[in-house]
């Protein structure tokens, strides 16, 4: 009965968010006053009045990682159109694993001590309100860019409008596309063809469900054993190249290897993030934000490592060794003045919108490159790249302020009991 209630809540929130999307004025009239009230707290763009204060540096690092994902996908375009490997910023896909670890840390910090007064329904409602409005926006943006592109699959096949609308509806309710299905409209096997990166949120949802039902109940010792077992599984996937991709960049489609690989890829860093949160004791580090940001850039910029096991070992080194240190340092540090606080809060606020809306514009960027007689050089593409990155940041901020925050506040008032 409880499960049925939760699913009813899920579809109600999804449906209401879709309705609100077409009627943004519903909550905008109160935005100015609510923003003034929110500004008096040390919380960023949360819709919940009882949210704990954020780790500001972790918010900032999440924003840095989101921007680095865009940079990685820019270079992915040159590799895709040029028919080669990603020569620059090859390991940018590891940002997703960093996101999963941050998520485990933050969710454990935010919710572990609330279960005496919070139900499963309350937890799932909060997570849906936090994540789903932007998922819907990402699907809408992806639909618009796909139509601008001419509704053309990668092989040049034209996709009927009806299938595009079905893909939009399924994405709004977060139902993944099966490879080869008519509603898998781009034709390259993506779980969410209108907005590819939504795959990571698919596994994030699974992680949230498993956290609420099982993982949170584990003792810290049991959680460490659980994490160690997952670490062995992840190392096997990475080092043995189970996917055949030459990397651990798995999870984006719904075949057997990608589903189980994506699940392990999410669960290990998520669980390790929980361990870090439970064991956390701050250390003193000067310049923590800049140190961690620089290390992320360096780690992601390492080129592909040739050799039977070398690249997989490097991925495991990053995920198992370096990322936990970065999370610990980031959680230990603090902003030193009002300006640095605003920078970290801004980066944290735009991180999710940037991540979830950027890839539809990457599709357009790839399409633009494919129309050229030959793959343009980076210098030739630089003006377009600059416009793309700046445009995504500006649009993400506008969507955050005019859509995401008002909608989340409205949904929180409706569904969250004070």
Model-inferred region functions:
Residues 131-205, 233-251, 256, 318-331:
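Membrane-interface helix-loop-helix regions
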Residues 58, 122-123, 131, 200, ...:
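Alpha-helical transmembrane segments and their helix-entry boundary regions
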Residues 1-48, 413-418:
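Short, intrinsically disordered terminal tails adjacent to the first/last structured region
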Residues 128:
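Active-site helix-to-loop segments that bind/position phosphate- or nucleotide-bearing substrates
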Residues 208-224, 228-229, 272:
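Hydrophobic, aromatic-rich transmembrane alpha-helices
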Residues 100-110:
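Central hydrophobic cores of alpha-helical transmembrane segments in multi-pass inner-membrane proteins
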Residues 59, 63-66, 96, 103, ...:
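Residues within membrane-spanning alpha-helices of integral membrane proteins
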Residues 40-57, 64-92, 109-121, 179-189, ...:
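Alpha-helical transmembrane segments in multi-pass integral membrane proteins
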